Amino acid sequence: MISAQNLVYSLQGRRLTDNVSLTFPGGEIVAILGPNGAGKSTLLRQLTGYLQPDSGECRLFNKPLNEWSITELAKHRAVMRQNSHMAFPFSVQEVIQMGRHPHRTGNQDNETAQIMALCDCQALANRDYRQLSGGEQQRVQLARLLVQLWEPTPSPKWLFLDEPTSALDIHHQQHLFRLLRQLVHERQFNVCCVLHDLNLAARYADRVVLMQKGKVIANGKPQDVLTQQALTMLYGADITVLKDPANHSPLIVLDH
């Protein structure tokens, strides 16, 4: 379980999170949605311990984040940021194996190979990470996070992803979310991601959190949260919300 109580954070006089309280029990994919500047990435950084709020508290497994050592926290949660640039010429395989850093044991070649296959990175193994496309880098970063959290097995782990599909083609978007569902169901992973694609959230998330101007304005199942009234008010766009005939999830369509 991860929880946030009364999170407040301001920067240059602007409230980026405004008295945010949330509890995620785990065993699900959570999508945080909202317009640009809503506070989504700021909230994610607070939930992961990378950003200390001005007031309020985050807990992981009922223990305050500031009471975890850096190493122990890294064994229980991993974070993909929006940008993961590197200045030095590491190969893809070397970048992925960096996920082993919190663990005392060395590189596990079989484990790394398995995860590279899961993330469709085998053909990239010997390439310079800096020369990859944005989508290829996102796949490599996901593999690095999985190496970081893969053991001990099984045990509850949290995976935080900030716009993980921003550079992925449609095939790899589908592949990513099918993999995340598999990890949730088979390996006790819990997933929290910031997304802009409403239909991906509607199709794959178990829970959706809507944010606006630093506040959480809705939190629940996609079919309860992603309504035409709520989304029109939140985004100011002309949309229609239909029902996907395949799985009855919301289907958001832009009006002409």
Swiss-Prot record:
It is a peripheral membrane protein. CDD domains: ABC_Iron-Siderophores_B12_Hemin. It is found in: Cell inner membrane. Its EC number is 7.6.2.-. GO terms for cellular component: plasma membrane. Its main location: membrane. Keywords: ATP-binding, Cell inner membrane, Cell membrane, Membrane, Nucleotide-binding, Translocase, Transport. Gene3D superfamilies: P-loop containing nucleotide triphosphate hydrolases (3.40.50.300). SUPFAM superfamilies: P-loop containing nucleoside triphosphate hydrolases (SSF52540). InterPro entries: AAA+_ATPase, ABC_transporter-like_ATP-bd, ABC_transporter-like_CS, P-loop_NTPase. It comes from the Bacteria. Residues 2-238 form the ABC transporter domain. GO terms for molecular function: ATP binding; ATP hydrolysis activity. PROSITE patterns: ABC_TRANSPORTER_1, ABC_TRANSPORTER_2, HMUV. ATP binds at residues 34-41. It holds the Pfam family ABC_tran. Belongs to the ABC transporter superfamily. Heme (hemin) importer (TC 3.A.1.14.5) family. Part of the ABC transporter complex HmuTUV involved in hemin import. Responsible for energy coupling to the transport system. The complex is composed of two ATP-binding proteins (HmuV), two transmembrane proteins (HmuU) and a solute-binding protein (HmuT). This is Hemin import ATP-binding protein HmuV.
